[in-house]
Amino acid sequence: MKAMIFNEFGPPGVLHYEELPDPVAGPDDVVIEVHAVSVNRVLDVAIRAGTAPHYGVAPPHVLGVDPSGVVVETGGNVSNLSVGDRVSVTMGMPGGGRYGIECFGGDSQLTRAPAASCVKVRDEVGFAEATVISRHGPVAYNLLFNLGELKAGQTVLILGAAGNLGSIGIQLAKAAGATVIAAAGSAARAAIGTALGADHAVDYSAVNLKDAIMDITDGDGVDLFYDNIANPDICPLGIESLKRFGRMVTAGAHGGPVVPVNFATVYHQQLTIMGNPRSKAQDALPCFDAAAEGNLKVVIDRVVPLAEAPAMHALMEADPAVGKIILDSTLG
């Protein structure tokens, strides 16, 4: 098979499309023919550049944490999947490892993954769409409902309305019966939140975020603040917008990561701040069901051949606003 591998940290040019041995399924694994895998700012671009050493990745390495495709081989102990099944791989692995981090990922024509990390994908959901959902859906679900304990009738502020974690969060929260306030750094990006079903949208480049939230909520504030950016100018305003006993959840910090926090607000308001970038495969199931029923849409910038991965890494480094990029090894 061919795979995109890097043998040293560095610029996008360290990525090489090379022949590697075909993977063989272990007893609890499956081998997947990859049809889609995404390019992530941290889990791909930063790791390849060597600017995310805390993940512990050492070259040589094949990136790609969220492939989707078709099962072509199953291990002897695998009973939940069969050859021909359409699947997506979620990052969490049995024993606490992370697919694409502690093992080779899916930037390849074939990949091996634990069967327990795979989720079946219904025919109504395309592979590119499935890859975005497998990467961001379980994390969004975990943040909103497992950590954030969001309930129908509560109000949630979601930053990054046009991003994938934000856009999926908006749709999941709205489907659960919450009042959703979407916020972004431009009018166009905030409008995406409204288009996805948010009750209110705020362009925080034009207004003070806290003032806008207090106007919308008649001074009450929000029950839950969902932020995966950590913008040091905006995140504190979100925290200040929480009502007493409010909760903040996060799984990202590419806009920071250091944010000034008024701890007097935290303890006087008895706030809870929680972070967790991980999730479980079962958290993907309601997301895939919603997508198959037409109730969850994802934002995809482009789908290109896997061979173009170096150019896509360079594009993502040069343009912080570029959307989700999907690599498809069946295109070349």
Which residues does each PLM region occupy?
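Mid-domain Rossmann-like dinucleotide-binding core that forms the NAD(H)/NADP(H) cofactor-binding site
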Residues: 86, 130-207
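Rossmann-fold dehydrogenase core element
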Residues: 246-251, 260-300
